[in-house]
Amino acid sequence: MIKQAIYQLSNKQDLTTEQAIVSMQEIMSGTASDIQIASFLTALRLKGETIDEITAFAQVMREKAQSIDYKDDLFEIVGTGGDEANTFNISTTAGFVISASGIKVAKHGNRSVSSKCGAADCLEALGTKLELDAKQNEKMLDEIGMCFMFAPKYHSSMKYASPVRRELGIRTVFNILGPLANPANANRQLMGVYQEELVEPLAKVLSNLGVKRGAVVYGYDGLDEITACNKTLVCEIKDKKLKTYTLDPRDYGMEYANSAELVGGDKNENAQITRDILAGTLGAKRNAVLLNAGMSIYLAKDGLSIQDGINIAKDTIDKGKADRKAHV
């Protein structure tokens, strides 16, 4: 099947859902050769991925993953990476605030690819054990309301594609598949992307994958987060319906920050930034966390406004709840 798929892609022809599913199954089972994987990814990149293709690929990744079967609603906050901004770990820090506000967070991520410090690097520096399996993380969700699923542990089938991705050295569909392949099938999600053109298509993909409430965001300064430095494009998902709008920090009482104020460092520096924010340090970094945590709380709890979410995030930090969550 993958040979036929490569032929079609090289002729700029879209794949059917079945072709996309079988091709990804061949890649993730070791059936496809390295040359076939490289050809497939390159031809797909040159053609451009469709919503149906991305949905099918993500479904295969979820099926192949070690999965967490959890009864309650779960929230995921994640970015694609690739924005080359070297910010501190905004989503990771926001995750503690979201969880401390009473929302169960099932975060999924990896070590750094394009920045100095990925989510896994920062959490490791904070003392988090990365190699927890599904049963252990289900227990974490029950006991503390938050878990981290280390991508290599949960997506072992990626081992066939990973060397090819490194050798290719270009963005491929896998750059966007990771955030779409949460092993706990979180049904509420805030996802940041590195390109404006991805916002609405990936919101449709998330909806296809069963996300009931969520949003895909792109900061107009290039961040794959809700930025504190500019406006952010948002495509919100609510029960299969999409709504696109811009979010401006100034509408929530925050002046624009300078991008240099959001820059982080290595994993130890970023871990300390996270500790400082959760302990109540004010400034642009806190504002970035409040925007992302506030939007997440709005998406996770029915009947709130974004301002309500930001207010809850502030209160969660100021009362010490987020700091305590990071020290559990």
Question: Residue spans of the language-model regions?
Answer:
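A generic alpha-helix surface/boundary motif
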Residues: 18, 35-38, 92, 117, ...
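Glycine-rich anion-binding loops and their surrounding alpha/beta cores
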Residues: 8, 63-66, 87, 102, ...
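Acidic, glycine/proline-rich low-complexity segments that act as flexible tails and inter-domain linkers
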Residues: 1-87, 101, 105, 255-262, ...
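A glycine-rich phosphate/pyrophosphate-binding beta-strand-loop-alpha-helix module
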Residues: 41, 88-144
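Acidic, glycine-rich active-site loops and adjacent beta-strand->loop/helix elements
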Residues: 79-84, 109-115, 154, 220-221
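Gly/Ser/Thr-rich beta-alpha loop segments that engage phosphate groups in nucleotides
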Residues: 14, 83-84, 111, 120, ...
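Alpha-helical scaffolding segments of alpha/beta enzyme cores, especially the outer helices
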Residues: 22, 56, 60, 96, ...
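Beta-strand segments within the central parallel beta-sheet cores of soluble alpha/beta enzyme folds
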Residues: 39, 55-58, 136-140, 217, ...
